[in-house]
Amino acid sequence: MATKKAGGSSSNGRDSIGKRLGVKKFGSERVIPGDIIVRQRGTKFHPGRNVGMGSDHTIFAMKSGSVSFSVGLRGRRFVHVV
């Protein structure tokens, strides 16, 4: 019988993988319908003109054009395709 308990491994040493969130198309970049503009958790950016929002809050283009960002009331950031 062992007189000393076996040394356990550390409970640290792991991390979750990155989720590749963020802005994918920046201001004045050209987009076509269906292009993803922003991947996000929650509504950091809100959909504006010619832009839709998916169930996971992904912002995507609904028409062809160039991307523009604006700040609305109460500091809300909007994404538009014009």
Curated annotation (Swiss-Prot):
InterPro entries: Ribosomal_bL27, Ribosomal_bL27_CS
Any one Pfam family match given in the protein's UniProt record, by short name: Ribosomal_L27
Keywords: Ribonucleoprotein, Ribosomal protein
GO molecular function terms noted in the UniProt entry: structural constituent of ribosome
SUPFAM superfamilies associated with the record: Ribosomal L27 protein-like
Cellular compartments per GO CC: ribonucleoprotein complex; ribosome
Any GO BP: translation
Disordered as annotated region, ranges: 1-20
Record family assignment: Belongs to the bacterial ribosomal protein bL27 family.
Stated name of the protein: Large ribosomal subunit protein bL27
Organism per entry: Neorickettsia sennetsu (strain ATCC VR-367 / Miyayama) (Ehrlichia sennetsu)
Gene responsible for this protein: rpmA
